[in-house]
């Protein structure tokens, strides 16, 4: 069991949190300057107060039970939520290790090309892998025609980086104005003025990890600050070339992650709708696709540096489930038909209260990827997506008439999109099975999100956090184990069960070995010891069990190959 630990914040509620309630009710007994006291928010949530986990006393008080559970063998390891929100992430992780907690995974968003720091952890929670195995199945040849289509429809020719920067700057100037004011207070006495919102928005990664206590500033931090092109004086403060503003450095580094998250994940990813499968937590929609060679290189690097990294395709925070992203990736396999269908739908629905072109295109893609989606779920998702985009509606000032029109438009559009979505599902399911097999066999620890054993076409929370019918899954698994042939409904469950059985049978093969095989650009194939894996990454490609291997999938027509060497073969 992996225990989820949230060290960064706690509920600031009188009724639910005695650590918060008791000091307030007994304020006269505490030596605290209440008029000037304040708390650090978690993101923009005032009811969640930041915890000073960097203080040894606070760490001991909050982690004694966690360490006890690990020592007693009741917990195998822990997952650290939002490690970037801590004042000193590296120091916190070293304290976990010193407390005897050795298996630690961190929820850390790495930008494409960014590497995890040399921390005492098993790895991240796997968003990088989720984005890689999505991009692997996006056809690079479709980038030009589908980008042209998006620009024609919306009239917006900005690259994603520009959209993201605008959204981050917007959030820094509005949502995080209190945090900016507190940062400014830490600069009291410096005559030079800085545009702190612009500085917070300019960082290309979630944060730097400069430690004022040790004076440690590594090359990655220096490069990140240089890439941000900050004013020289501000850069010198953040790289500790000029000392005396340690509190500012710490708080600045704690503030860039929420600016990035709210600006990119919760705003820009809802504004830039070129191909929605690329709009994922930790992803970069500017990166259109990933080659087989690049996936192999990433797998080899992971095996070398962090072999116990989690591999995810869906989590509680993903914008879309892995299966839905697979269907949307399949849109790149038929760019010509996609253009024709979109133009046809727009003609048919031109007078049905259509929202703006960008929102319209978002609705078409969502219906195609999540079909069949119940209207109630679609309505709830549209409301959230429109408000997160903050263009024509928002959480602070909801545009109820526009939201109603968008929901009505989606309801009418569904009947036109449905036949296309049904055809798309065949290719999408093929991609989803291939992604699932890669997650189960690539270097790392496969992480299965609840309910993902069967097809899951869900969108962001709360949709992806609905109750799971475990009884149904147990019944279907029992039938498969009793010899039932996999159907379309059970194909994914069958693949997962067979792959896990193989991992249990041959643990040594999945510990160290990984040998990429050159099967051309349209097939991803490799061996892990005596295990052979092959998946097609384009519709025209096919794979088969090689000579000298036994089919672990017993000939099931899943479009992928999982095989082990025939022990009778010499």
Residues covered by each model-derived region:
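Catalytic and substrate-binding clefts that recognize carbohydrates or anionic sugar/phosphate headgroups
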Residues: 210, 214-332
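Carbohydrate-binding surface patches
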Residues: 491, 501, 515-544
């Amino acid at each position: 069991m992996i225990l989820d630990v949230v060290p960064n914040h706690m509920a600031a509620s009188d009724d639910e949190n005695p650590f918060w309630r008791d000091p307030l009710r007994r304020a006269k007994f505490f030596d605290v300057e209440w008029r000037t006291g304040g708390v650090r928010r978690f993101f923009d949530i005032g009811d969640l107060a930041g915890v000073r986990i960097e203080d040894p006393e606070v760490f001991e008080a909050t982690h004694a039970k966690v360490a006890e559970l690990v020592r007693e063998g009741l917990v195998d390891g822990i997952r650290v939520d939002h490690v970037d929100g801590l004042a000193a992430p590296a120091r916190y992780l070293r304290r976990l290790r010193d407390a005897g907690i050795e298996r630690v995974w961190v929820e850390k968003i790495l930008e494409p090309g960014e590497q995890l720091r040399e921390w005492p952890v098993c790895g991240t929670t796997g968003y990088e892998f989720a984005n890689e195995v999505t991009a692997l199945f996006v056809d690079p040849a479709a980038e030009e025609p589908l980008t042209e289509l998006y620009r024609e429809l919306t009239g917006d020719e900005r690259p994603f980086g520009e959209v993201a920067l605008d959204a981050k700057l917007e959030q820094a100037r509005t949502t995080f104005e209190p945090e900016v004011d507190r940062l400014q207070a830490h600069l009291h006495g410096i005559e030079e003025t800085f545009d702190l919102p612009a500085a917070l928005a300019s960082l290309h990664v979630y944060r730097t990890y400069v430690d004022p206590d040790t004076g440690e500033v590594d090359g990655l931090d220096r490069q990140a600050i240089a890439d941000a092109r900050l004013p020289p004086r501000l850069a010198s403060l953040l790289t500790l070339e000029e000392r005396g503003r340690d509190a500012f450095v710490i708080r600045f580094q704690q503030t860039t992650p929420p600016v990035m998250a709210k600006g990119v994940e919760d705003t820009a990813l809802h504004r830039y709708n070129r191909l929605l499968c690329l709009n994922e937590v930790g992803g970069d929609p500017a990166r259109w696709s990933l080659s087989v060679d690049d996936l192999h290189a990433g797998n080899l690097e992971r095996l070398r540096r962090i072999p116990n990294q989690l591999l995810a395709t869906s989590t509680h925070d993903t914008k879309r489930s892995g299966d839905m992203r697979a269907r949307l990736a399949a849109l790149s396999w038929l760019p010509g038909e996609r253009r024709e269908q979109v133009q046809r739908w727009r003609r048919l629905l031109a007078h049905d209260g259509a929202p703006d072109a960008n929102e319209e295109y978002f609705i078409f893609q969502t219906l195609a990827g999540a079909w069949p989606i119940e209207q109630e779920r679609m309505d709830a998702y549209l409301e959230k997506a429109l408000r997160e985009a903050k263009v024509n509606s928002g959480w602070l000032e909801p545009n109820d008439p526009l939201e109603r029109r968008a929901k009505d438009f989606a309801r009418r559009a569904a009947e036109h999109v449905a036949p296309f979505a049904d055809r798309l599902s065949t290719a999408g399911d093929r991609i989803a099975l291939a992604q699932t097999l890669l997650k189960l066999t690539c270097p790392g620890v496969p992480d299965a999100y609840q309910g993902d054993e069967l097809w899951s076409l869900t969108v962001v929370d709360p949709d992806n956090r609905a109750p799971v019918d475990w009884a149904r899954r147990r019944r279907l698994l029992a039938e498969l184990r009793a010899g039932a042939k996999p159907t379309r409904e059970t194909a994914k469950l069958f693949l997962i069960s067979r792959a896990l059985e193989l991992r249990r049978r041959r643990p040594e093969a999945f510990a160290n070995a990984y040998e990429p095989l050159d099967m051309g650009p349209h097939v991803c194939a490799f061996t892990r010891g005596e295990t052979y894996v092959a998946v097609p990454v384009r519709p025209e490609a096919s794979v088969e069990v090689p000579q000298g291997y036994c089919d672990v999938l017993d000939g099931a027509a899943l479009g992928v190959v999982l095989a082990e060497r025939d022990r009778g073969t010499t």
